[in-house]
């Protein structure tokens, strides 16, 4: 029996909301502020301070729409060999990378 598409979409949205709340729940506010600074300054040095692109591609909500969160986390942590995108795993753990992915996918511009 096939599941109606709208129910699948609702289920995926609910799972995404649960994932997002779980990611935020365990990162202290002070670290979230540090991560936003890293996103703005370090990532922004290549992707643009407003995330609209530069040396690296845009990191806007629209530009990342449809990209799997797991893939984005892997790029953040491990970089992209053969490109200027460096790995950030020395500075971030998986949970922090997931938090950054959430911020990017939601188009947030501040930590809170």
Residue ranges and their predicted role:
Residues 39-49, 100-104:
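The canonical Cys-X-X-Cys-His
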Residues 52-53, 106-112:
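Inter-heme linker and motif-flanking segments adjacent to c-type heme-binding CXXCH motifs
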Residues 41, 57, 83:
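Glycine-centered loop/turn positions within well-structured domains
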Residues 1-6:
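N-terminal secretory signal peptides that target proteins for export/translocation
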Residues 25-29, 50-62:
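His/Cys-centered metal/cofactor-coordination and adjacent catalytic loops
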Residues 11-20:
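Bacterial N-terminal signal peptides
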Residues 61-109:
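Extracytoplasmic electron-transfer domains, predominantly the class I c-type cytochrome c fold
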Residues 19-38, 112:
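Electrostatic cytochrome c docking/interface patches
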């Amino acid at each position: 029996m096939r599941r109606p598409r709208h129910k699948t979409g609702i289920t995926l949205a609910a799972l995404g909301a649960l994932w997002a709340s779980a990611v935020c729940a365990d990162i202290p506010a002070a670290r979230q502020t540090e991560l936003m600074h890293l996103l703005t300054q370090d990532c922004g040095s290549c992707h643009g301070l407003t995330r609209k692109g530069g040396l690296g591609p845009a990191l806007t909500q629209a530009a990342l729409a449809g990209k799997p969160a797991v893939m984005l986390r892997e790029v953040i942590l491990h970089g992209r060999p053969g490109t200027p995108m460096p790995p950030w795993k020395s500075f971030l753990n998986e949970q922090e990378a997931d938090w950054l992915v959430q911020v990017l996918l939601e188009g947030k511009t501040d930590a809170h």
